[in-house]
Amino acid sequence: MRIRTVLSAAFVGLLAIPAQSRAADPICGDVNTSGTVTTADALSVLKRAVGQPVALQCPAAATPLESGQSECFNEGGDVINCAGTGQDAALKKGVPATYTDNGNGTITDETTGLTWEKLSEDGSIHDEGNVYTWSEALDRVDTLNSQSFAGHNDWRLPNIVEARTLLNFDTFSPAVAPEFDSNCGTGCTVLTCNCIQPDWYWTSTTYQETNEDAWFVDMYNGYTDSTTKTEQNFARAVRGGL
């Protein structure tokens, strides 16, 4: 039996916003020379720091994305006054995601730098109703690349961190920004709409304890869990960014 893992809105704080490379810094810099300081760099720094008596003078972490929450709640789920709760709506921390429709079937999050495939209701490969096993979702991305969708051939299935940047915890069904649930209707194309199912979307991230499972993000309410790779879920491609 799977143990369900529910990640709170605070997980958004782990999302990296593109930062300037600090390759010149031998301790806190771009350790893996990816062009930005990433989680992988941070892990490398921590490993090297073990046993060192001196304090590391590392730059401050990048500002996290805001969760989107505008109301506070008690344990029973009732809306309460935010004063003194320490909840996201009270603190109002982070920066908002801002989106640009590129007019070619894609939409770019200017905050993270991620460019997302828009989804349609026209029966095409972009149709929001298409479902895939995990391997089929990867094959779908290969097809988009072979077709040079929107002029690019570097599309991929988003990892768990990238997929969670779509979430807006101020709403549900779907728990996303309105830019990802706009103008949907029978026959609409990626040039005229951007659709989403309030359901499970695959990520490329394999579950650590077993290669037979992978992580998904539930666009209904924002929780994250893993499931068998043979299950059929929805998919959306991404490129660039983090």
Q: Across the structure, where does each feature detected by a protein language model lie?
A:
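Generic anion/oxyanion-binding catalytic loop in active/binding sites
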Residues: 12, 31-34, 126, 226
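Alpha-helical segments with a strong preference for the paired helices of cellulosomal dockerin domains
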Residues: 23-25, 31-59, 164, 168
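Glycine-aromatic-enriched surface loops/turns that form tight recognition elements
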Residues: 60-156, 160-242
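Intrinsically disordered, low-complexity regions enriched in serine, threonine, proline
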Residues: 1, 19, 233-236
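Bacterial N-terminal signal peptides
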Residues: 8-16
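Bacterial N-terminal signal peptides that target proteins for export
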Residues: 1-9
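Sec/Tat signal peptide C-region and signal peptidase I cleavage site
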Residues: 17-23
